Amino acid sequence: MKPEPQSEAELMERAHDIAGLSFAELADEAGMTVPENLKRDKGWVGQLLEWHLGAPAGSKPQQDFSKLGIELKSIPIGYNGRPLETTFVCVAPLTGVQGLTWETSHVRNKLSRVLWVPVEGEREIPLAERRVGTPLIWSPDKEEEQILRNDWEELMEMIVFGKFDQISARHGEALHLRPKAANAKALTEAYSSNGKPMKTLPRGFYLRTQFTEQILLKHYINVQSE
């Protein structure tokens, strides 16, 4: 793995250096094997980018570049330039949630400064031939942060009151909550609506594609107008 970048400028320079390169080229330099597909290797693209950008944190609660306060997110893009899937932010806490605030939440910490790296994501393009796009660095503006905060507070309130069965895909404008488990047997501790301990599927916070699409649009419109 490349050494950890010491500044945001150095990180961005590295991200720009790999823009336009294929996964095969990047994997070759990193000594990694390109899998046939991502069904069993969902985190492979992220690991490849982490190697080239020098991200030391892995999937711990802190940001990928904790010294710089920056989170790395790859974002698969379709032919139309739109995100193809939601973006995982972090695992949702289901116990010990009393007194949690937006200001100290993992979601806010992870999304305070994000390096977005678009990658070709159309399934008909062989994985080895997919290329990395132009990176962008982003922090939520006041409006975006308010939307995220409102969503987080609404969803966390439902968790506090044990309303897991009532949380659906329609809750949350930018952020939504859904089960995150490789199989249905991977249960975790939680509390039911009557306060009794129970087992349920782990949940994860995800950004909706409409929200990430707006981030990309705003950025590239601003770049073109400069």
From Swiss-Prot:
Gene3D superfamilies registered for this protein in UniProt: DNA mismatch repair MutH/Restriction endonuclease, type II
Major subcellular site: cytoplasm
Gene Ontology cellular-component terms listed: cytoplasm
Keyword terms, alphabetized: Cytoplasm, DNA damage, DNA repair, Endonuclease, Hydrolase, Nuclease
Single annotated GO MF: DNA binding
GO aspect biological process, one term: mismatch repair
Subcellular location: Cytoplasm
Family matches, as SUPFAM superfamilies: Restriction endonuclease-like
Pfam families named among the record's database cross-references: MutH
Family: Belongs to the MutH family.
HAMAP family on file: MutH
Role summary: Sequence-specific endonuclease that cleaves unmethylated GATC sequences. It is involved in DNA mismatch repair.
Protein name: DNA mismatch repair protein MutH
Gene designation per UniProt: mutH
